[in-house]
Amino acid sequence: MPKMKTHRGAAKRFSKTGTGKIKMAHAFTSHILTSKTRKNKRNLRKGGIVAASDHKNISCLIPYK
């Protein structure tokens, strides 16, 4: 059976941790920031973990990462 292909767009956006969780960066941080509060922007800088409902689909996109 041939190797699975990695989805290159997903590989740039997600990475796996040592325990198997998938890390991601938050969206809504590039423009239109004046309407967002300081607290909101500060919390968006922190990384996030992909939800359990999305974990299976994203892990299929990045099988070797």
From Swiss-Prot:
GO biological process: translation
Keyword Ribonucleoprotein: yes
MF term (GO), any: structural constituent of ribosome
Entries under Pfam families matching the protein: Ribosomal_L35p
The entry's keywords: Ribonucleoprotein, Ribosomal protein
Gene Ontology annotations for the cellular component aspect, listed alphabetically: cytosolic large ribosomal subunit
UniProt keyword annotation of Cell cycle present: no
NCBIfam families: rpmI_bact (TIGR00001)
Matching PANTHER family: 54S RIBOSOMAL PROTEIN BL35M, LARGE RIBOSOMAL SUBUNIT PROTEIN BL35M
Similarity annotation: Belongs to the bacterial ribosomal protein bL35 family.
Protein name: Large ribosomal subunit protein bL35
Organism (species): Citrifermentans bemidjiense (strain ATCC BAA-1014 / DSM 16622 / JCM 12645 / Bem)
